[in-house]
Amino acid sequence: LARIGELCWNHHVTVISDEIHCDLTDPGYDYVPFASVNEQCAMNSVTCMAPTKTFNIAGLNTAAVMIPNPVLRHKVWRALNTDEVAEPNAFAMTATLAAFNESEPWLEELRAYLAGNKAEARAMINEYNAAAAPERRIALIESHATYLLWVDCSKLTHDTALLCEHLKRNHQVMFSEGAEYGGNGH
């Protein structure tokens, strides 16, 4: 992260750090906010976060930005207020404060549950791979955060959209082919 911060600083690129999944680390792993890496990262970043993913309250439309740099903070403040997206309702504010301040036991249970889901997925992939020819094996990309899984299916097909449709139709499993993140989806 420090190297990314240095490169962005040197090339006058502001880092917008989407840390919406920050609370969803696997048990035993910690989250490192980008702005906490060093002063350079803090002064050249906008950290976006919300309780919406972790606490399943997206309908409340609540989020926050943390911007240590006062000049950058003012620019973002102007943009948010010009577009009138900076006025949360009272219920959203109360729910957000409760989520962040009063939910640690529940959050620890959630993190353990999600880690169990990942272990189950890993076991299923290992079982599949044990029976599959080497050229047909898939790989679970190791991750220690979020409830999302990245599965490399490039040995199965180059038509990831077709694979996703097959999995949805025949196995009731929803996949995103990943093309929206750039590249060819595998």
Regions found by a protein language model. Give the residues of each.
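Conserved core segment of the aminotransferase class I/II
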Residues: 39-115, 165
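Glycine-centered flexible beta-alpha turn that most often forms the glycine-rich phosphate-binding loop
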Residues: 18
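The start of beta-strands in P-loop NTPase/AAA+ ATPase cores
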Residues: 12-14, 173
